[in-house]
A protein has these predicted regions:
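Short, amphipathic C-terminal "tail helix"
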Residues: 64-109
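Gly/Pro-rich interdomain helix-loop hinge
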Residues: 1-67, 107
């Protein structure tokens, strides 16, 4: 859900996510509500499958995360798969996104 919320700032990606939500029969009267429903549904699946909600819940220690997050962000941005992401990302924003996934905070950038 964190990456969906990041990518949903891109209008084309947002419409695609809304369309996925519609096809899944999820509720929402506007694009933002549909995207939120999609993220909530993914969260529900993750709970059912015992997938931790955050990187912290995986057992990664905070000091280790803070020590390595900048390098991980740099490597992630350089990965070939990142180029196919619908919304461009630089190392600074990747670090912010990873921080959201570690602490479970809202992606608002």
């Amino acid at each position: 859900p964190y990456v969906i919320k990041y990518n949903a700032k891109d209008p084309v990606a947002a419409e695609r996510y809304a369309e996925i939500a519609r096809r899944l029969g999820l509720e929402g009267t506007c694009q933002k509500a549909l995207i939120n429903s999609l993220c909530e549904k993914i969260d529900e699946f993750n709970v059912r499958l015992n997938i931790p909600k955050t990187l912290k819940d995986f057992g990664i220690q905070e000091d280790e995360f803070k020590e390595k997050v900048a390098k991980i962000a740099e490597l992630a941005v350089g990965d070939a798969c990142t180029g196919s992401n619908p919304r461009a990302i630089d190392p600074a924003n990747m670090e912010k996104l990873l921080t959201c996934t570690y602490y479970g905070t809202e992606v608002d950038f």
